[in-house]
């Protein structure tokens, strides 16, 4: 997986001295799926050797839409950690931490909220889309302001790069504006981040109607068994105009072919040609896709099993990552308070 840097500044991403830092993460509202993998997670795995990588489990932001389902939160936090480790995130190279355990993030969020307009948040396209998806007629304070919290997540770690799906670009743009505003108002102590969008910014779901989503029941999860993958691919939407096996197909409108293009690139051209000529049927095409997906997921299943059998190790990984993240956040907040002249006990007073 590669990806491209979406330069919101209109220029190239400037490398700075020392190891650059990445901040990325997910809300723990359920298991991660193939859309997460190609949209962001594969880039995190690839870049963790090159960058100082921080991965946030955004449990506070999960409450913006799941506040009434908090009994699942702890299970989901550990579940998403398993997804990271199974996908190849190395805790020796990447710092995995829990958002709610870093109080400095919430302090910085409050400072940012003092100069961030409510109208800017209301007109954020991702906020509007998610509000409609969840049926929010009257947005809560926490939901409306979560992009400000995201800006604090990113900037408190001085992240240069943020691997995201394309629907998160408005949030990165807002984070850049907030950081720029802070640096102009006080002192330039924070870093303006860039968005790194995956090779497949938005993967269509199994139903072919919308992007893959855990809430829409159209996802292949990284934690799915081989039998579950087989079943889901058998039921995936294909070319609706193709009735018989020998009918010429239209791969450009077929969800299964889109997955071949993404996950089976080496055979995609052959499959496209065979589909158009009617020499391969949908059943055989789906079997080849399921085989390819299971081949890709099998190493993840092996890593998952290793960590599932040692829950104490998973807890220690989270605790150590959170300790490290807390230390970095404290250092940044010392600079922030100094810049804002609210470090009241760090200098002499004159009455």
Show which residues each predicted segment covers.
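Short, Lys/Arg-enriched N-terminal segments with co-localized hydrophobic residues
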Residues: 2-14
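N-terminal Rossmann-like or analogous alpha/beta NTP/dinucleotide-binding catalytic cores
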Residues: 16-152, 305
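Conserved nucleotide- and phosphate/pyrophosphate-binding catalytic cores
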Residues: 36, 170, 176-351
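Short helix-capping/linker segments at secondary-structure and domain boundaries
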Residues: 118-122, 156-163, 264-272, 301
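Internal, conserved structured core segments that host functional sites
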Residues: 126-129, 133-178, 182, 204
């Amino acid at each position: 997986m590669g990806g491209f840097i979406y330069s919101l500044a209109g220029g190239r991403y400037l490398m700075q001295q020392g190891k650059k830092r990445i901040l990325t993460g997910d809300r723990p509202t359920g298991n991660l799926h193939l859309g997460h993998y190609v949209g962001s997670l594969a880039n995190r795995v690839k870049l963790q050797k090159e960058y100082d990588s921080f991965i946030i489990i955004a449990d506070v932001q999960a409450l913006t839409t799941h506040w009434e389902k908090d009994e699942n939160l702890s299970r989901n936090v550990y579940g998403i950690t398993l997804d990271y480790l199974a996908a190849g995130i190395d805790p020796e190279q990447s710092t995995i931490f829990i958002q709610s355990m870093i109080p400095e993030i919430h302090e910085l969020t409050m400072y940012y909220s003092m100069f961030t307009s409510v109208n800017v948040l209301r007109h954020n396209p991702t906020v509007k889309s998610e509000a409609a998806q969840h049926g929010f007629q009257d947005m809560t304070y926490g939901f409306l302001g979560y992009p400000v919290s995201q800006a604090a997540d990113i900037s408190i770690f001085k992240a240069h790069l943020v691997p995201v799906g394309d629907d998160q670009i408005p949030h990165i743009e807002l984070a850049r504006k907030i950081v720029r505003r802070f640096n102009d108002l006080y002192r330039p102590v924070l870093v303006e981040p860039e968005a790194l969008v995956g090779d497949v910014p938005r993967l269509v779901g199994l139903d072919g109607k919308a992007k893959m989503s855990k809430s829409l029941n159209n996802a292949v999860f990284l934690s799915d068994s081989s039998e579950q993958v087989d079943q889901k691919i058998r039921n995936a939407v294909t070319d609706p105009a193709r009735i018989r096996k020998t009918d010429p197909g239209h791969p450009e409108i077929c969800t299964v072919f889109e997955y071949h293009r993404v996950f089976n690139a080496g055979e995609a051209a052959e499959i496209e040609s065979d589909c158009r000529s009617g020499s391969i049927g949908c059943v055989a095409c789906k079997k080849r896709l399921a085989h390819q997906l299971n081949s890709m997921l099998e190493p993840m299943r092996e890593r998952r099993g290793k960590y599932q059998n040692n829950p104490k190790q998973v807890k220690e990984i989270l605790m150590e990552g959170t300790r490290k993240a807390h230390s970095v956040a404290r250092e940044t907040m010392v600079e922030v308070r100094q810049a804002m002249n609210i470090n009241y006990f760090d200098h002499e007073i004159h009455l």
